[in-house]
């Protein structure tokens, strides 16, 4: 987790010797860890390019980087991420307003934290695949759009459409009580988006050792 964190924030190629020194391990251990990391991130179309003696760089789509974080190392990196009291209050107000259960809110919260941290470190989503673009204008998008308008006022910077779409993924298809006025009971999403959400939930289930019943979180597609 530490190695990925350093590489994803590096503004220039990272020397293997520097990683070894920071992690307080032998160079051979670092190289072995790098090789294992390369294999893990390969399925996300992410690569660690460069050479040990000239510097290494993490290459790949920002969305895929976030997906890897959410599915694999969120707890190690963001467990105590400082959001500030005002932002936390707005998040909990959002949960209460939509009558979100703990699991559903936890899913949304993770997406939000990763989005904020990546944006504030200068790493924004420039483009998403067409299957995610279809969320634009959906109920999920409108809910997130309104919420992020409030966050913009607190943060003092603009949040792009692409970032709003990213956060919408965490809301799309979520089941809420029929009497919740601010979200439609049924949100139509594509099979691709649904598969993505289910895959991430499976990862969260494995990390937290809790059972997730898919039909409690998703509407029929």
Name what the model sees in each region.
Residues 1-221:
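A cross-family "folded-core" feature that marks the main globular domain of proteins
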């Amino acid at each position: 987790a530490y190695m990925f964190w350093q590489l994803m924030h590096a503004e220039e190629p990272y020397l293997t010797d520097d990683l070894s020194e920071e992690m307080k391990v032998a160079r051979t251990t670092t190289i072995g860890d790098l090789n294992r990391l390369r294999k893990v991130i390969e399925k996300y179309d992410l690569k660690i390019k460069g050479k040990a003696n000239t510097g290494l760089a993490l290459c790949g789509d920002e969305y895929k980087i976030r997906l890897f974080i959410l599915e694999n190392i969120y707890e190690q990196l963001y467990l105590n991420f400082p959001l500030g009291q005002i932002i936390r209050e707005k998040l909990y107000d959002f949960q209460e307003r939509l009558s979100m259960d703990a699991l559903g809110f936890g899913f949304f919260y993770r997406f939000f934290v990763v989005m904020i941290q990546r944006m504030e470190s200068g790493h924004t989503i420039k483009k998403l695949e067409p299957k995610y673009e279809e969320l634009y204008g959906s109920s999920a998008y409108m809910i997130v759009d309104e919420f992020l308008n409030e966050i913009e006022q607190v943060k003092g910077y603009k949040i792009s459409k692409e970032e709003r779409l990213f956060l919408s993924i965490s809301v799309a298809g979520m089941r809420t009580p029929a009497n919740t006025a601010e979200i439609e009971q049924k949100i139509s999403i594509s099979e691709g988006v649904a598969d993505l959400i289910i895959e991430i939930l499976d990862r969260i289930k494995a990390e937290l050792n809790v059972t997730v019943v898919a039909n409690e979180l998703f509407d029929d597609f």
